């Protein structure tokens, strides 16, 4: 396995995970199996799992690094998703 160039590849993987993790969490949310209050935690866990799975890709970091990156991406993805949905709720209909 190649050694990861810490800033470059990690940023690429985290960017991908920030986009993909909310998609998985939204799918989980639609099942209504998990209460909404737990979705941010689920997002972090999903990100960590996806990060762990990404260790099989070329140029990825160690398992610990990728789990850490995935968990951070999951947390960031949730924050980004919430920011846009709350903004849409607040400004969506009033701006027209």
Swiss-Prot record:
InterPro entries: Phage_A118_holin/antiholin (IPR009708). It is found in: Host cell inner membrane. It is a multi-pass membrane protein. This is Antiholin. It comes from Listeria phage A500. GO terms for biological process: killing of cells of another organism. Residues 1-32, 82-96 are cytoplasmic. One of its GO terms (cellular component) is membrane. The keyword Chaperone does not apply. Keywords: Cytolysis, Host cell inner membrane, Host cell lysis by virus, Host cell membrane, Host membrane, Membrane, Transmembrane, Transmembrane helix, Viral release from host cell. The keyword Manganese does not apply. The chain crosses the membrane at residues 33-55, 61-81. Its main location: host cell. Residues 56-60 are periplasmic. Isoform Holin has 3 transmembrane regions whereas isoform Antiholin lacks the first transmembrane region. Isoform Antiholin: Counteracts the aggregation of the holin molecules and thus of pore formation. Pfam families: Phage_holin_5_1.
